[in-house]
Amino acid sequence: MDPDHQLASLARDIEVERVRGGVKAAEDRRAICRTRSRIDRGRDPRELVIAQGSPAIVGHSHNIDSTRLDFDLTSEQQSIRKLAKDFADKEIAPGARERDRNETFPKEVLRKMAPLGLLGGPVPEKYGGIGIDYVSHALVTEEVGRADSSVRTTLSVQISLVEMTILKFGTEEQKQRWLPRLCKGEVIGCFGLTEPEVGSDATKIRTSAKRDGDSWVLRGRKTWISNGSVSGLALVFAQADPSKEDKGITAFVLERDRQPYGSQALHGKLGLRSSDSSELILEDVRVPDANRLGEVGQGFKIAMSALDSGRYSVAAGAVGVAQACIDASVTYATTRKTFGKPIAGHQLVTELIADMVVETEAARLLVWRAGDLKDKGRPNTRETSIAKLYASEAAQRAADNAIQIHGGYGFSDEFPVERYWRDARVNRLYEGTTQIQKLIIGRFATGIDAIG
């Protein structure tokens, strides 16, 4: 059978499996737990294949060690995607508009996500997670982002910034102490790095940490902290030795019921209105040294590692927004009629949709490439920044095109595309702005650090 017929046959098989409904939720959960980092090598007509024998792609210090790239999903990964999609369609998307209008934090959605393991996906089972691989994590994040970026933001902070950072840098006692509660949704976590006067240049944070016996006393303010006012646990960065600059920054985990920190919710945001954004207020908060994450002076390294993880999640969520724009635009363009035919029959409208599809597919593959490297334990900062940059920009363009296709209706929240546009905008800001991503990518290309 020639390749085209093989692909067509596989496409039919996948569609039949989709219509059958896949596996039940309990079977999905068992499938998730089995996934780990396995990557089968089947064929999927939607994904990129570089034929065997074609030249390898070469980048600065990132030679690809294979002449064949294959981004197929395993059956387990397909089950994970279906589980996340079904949950997003049933439990997240229906209430997104009202949550956005009322700035309502999605605590009920999170409560329903926890039993499915979606609050601790890539965390190993022994710490309360379900141990899925990074590509699977991207699939879940994309589907959640497709339904509601506010929920996706909450999830990204909980998993990528807080859980995965504790997993990577915490002691065994710290992992056992905090991760199960986070994965079960018993406590919401936040990540306290940004300050009123300090954003991209995190080496200049002013929050102080002064040693006092077996404790530290933290003083300062953080701002634009997602999950801040709803959090029961905060991963906070403070300067323990200003003379050492970034080498003095140290990380601490604060439990609000034991190390009471203050918070003040921020309102009037352009987008992500149902996610929580807050100031954190640290007024001589006493923190045991046992709550220090990593070594003294290791905080900046920990923060950069966490942001790298967060960028991956933001990129996957941005793909979800772009896909939502495509879905809404196709539905509208094939039903709305002008001049006696659906507007999809007008070439300039079709061009807008085609542009959206191309950029979304490209962004998705960039995310999967970064995830594949993460699963293999290989360096991926460059690839993650590329994915974050491209996906966030593509999502904004897709949302803009979607509004154009919807015309006047796109300017009203009776249709979701205006929310997609507002929510997409922040992807170009947090976890490193578009400009910061370009500086990182440029450093890998030239070997020269233009940041400072």
Language model features by range: what are they?
Residues 185-193:
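A short, Trp-centered hydrophobic/proline-enriched beta-strand micro-motif
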Residues 1, 14-19, 23, 32, ...:
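Hydrophobic alpha-helical signal/anchor motif
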Residues 284-302:
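Long, acidic (Asp/Glu-rich), low-complexity accessory segments flanking structured domains
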Residues 204, 257-286:
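Flexible, small-/acidic-enriched active-site or ligand-binding loops
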Residues 34, 51-157, 169-174, 181-186, ...:
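Alpha-helical interface subdomain recognition
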Residues 2-5, 13, 28, 40, ...:
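Intrinsic-disorder-associated, low-complexity terminal segments enriched in Asp/Asn/His/Tyr and depleted
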Residues 215, 219-263:
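A short core secondary-structure module
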Residues 155, 182, 197-200, 224-227, ...:
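Short Gly/Pro-enriched turn/cap motifs at secondary-structure boundaries
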